Amino acid sequence: MRVAYVDPFSGASGDMLLGALVDAGVPPEELADRLASALDVDGYRLVVERVVRRGLAGTQVRVIVEAAQPARDWAEIRDLLSASALPPRVKERALAVFRRLAEAEASVHSVPLESVHFHEVGAVDSIVDVVGVVWGFELLGVEEITCGPLPLSRGWVETAHGRLPVPAPATALLLAQAGAPLVPLDIEAELVTPTGAALLVELARFVRPAFLPERVGYGFGTRELPWPNALRLWIGEAFAVPSRLDEAELLLEANLDDMNPQFIEPLVDQLFAAGALDVYLTPIVMKRSRPAVIVSAICRAKDRPVLERVLFEHSTTFGVRGIPIERTKLARRSVAVATRWGEVAVKLKIVQDRIVDAVPEYRDCLAIHQRTGLPIREIWNEAARLAAVWIGQRVGEEDQEATLPE
């Protein structure tokens, strides 16, 4: 799956995201042509520049407005986008971004949603930024967008409502609603704009993904800062990483000195059914010379609650010990051999890509013994002889799931 990771180390705005997308591979001429043909707006042009700021190179995209633009309200922007020739997914996501922003503005200024005037973000430049960013991710084939922590700056910003604190109230509400992670940055400047916040909150999840990076783009803003005023965008392929909980294993133990031994077999069966990787019994002598048994179950850490419940419900114990363990596990394969009396599964033991042993499965041999009455030793020996042809063969990592030659 193709993913994008937004690293807003110096903030986020619509033009910074658009610049990062172009820097990461979106063809600017193609994007400009698509926007011009799909949107019923004019009086603007896209200017794309390669810039170097504070020693870092990237792309700056500016929407140059060449004619006066109205301060559109939410209803006007909704109608404009709904009537556009945008692809359905781009249209839907762009509308969702503006609706989210309109709801935030309505909330912080206590006005009805339909009467929200965007002022700063209602002009054509913000419409082009929002639609361009949504379409840019589509052009790169991105299926999932994630975002890192955003900088929390201070100061004031001049708006149509007057002088307001940074982050602007709508920006602050958007970030709070999304639970976006914030990192304090001691500078008087608006680093995260309402448009940038709405785009990230609507399109992205605030997590760090596991992915194989293919390209990196930098999109620059217009403000001069003591560091590169840029947003970094990673594009790559996602891959699954097992969590620590999935990998961790435990040894659960309980001492039983007052339980009918006949009840231990069903207890062991229940532990295996609940997900135990292995279960074994150890005879011990407890206080007052009582004979007892330790029931030990190896399990994945995530399965601990289920196995503990089995031990408490199906044994007489009042307590269970949990001990973290580490195991070194060899690669193994399971194949089948055809004996004269039926198939027997065989486990192949692999060390450094070489098969070093082939062990018939006892249960299969037992089933044939019970059906035929033959000595189980004879059945096991024939299966082992047939399986011996694999011993010594090499198995490459890429062939672990392939069928070995017979």
Curated annotation (Swiss-Prot):
Single GO MF descriptor: lyase activity
**Gene3D superfamilies of this UniProt entry?**
mk0293 like domain, Transcriptional regulatory protein pf0864 domain like
Keywords associated with the record: Nickel
Please indicate which superkingdom the organism of origin belongs to. Bacteria
Matching Pfam families, A to Z?
Ni_insertion
- Family stated for the protein in its record: Belongs to the LarC family.
> Can you say what this protein is called?
Putative nickel insertion protein
Where is the organism placed in the taxonomic lineage, from the top? Bacteria, Pseudomonadati, Thermomicrobiota, Thermomicrobia, Thermomicrobiales
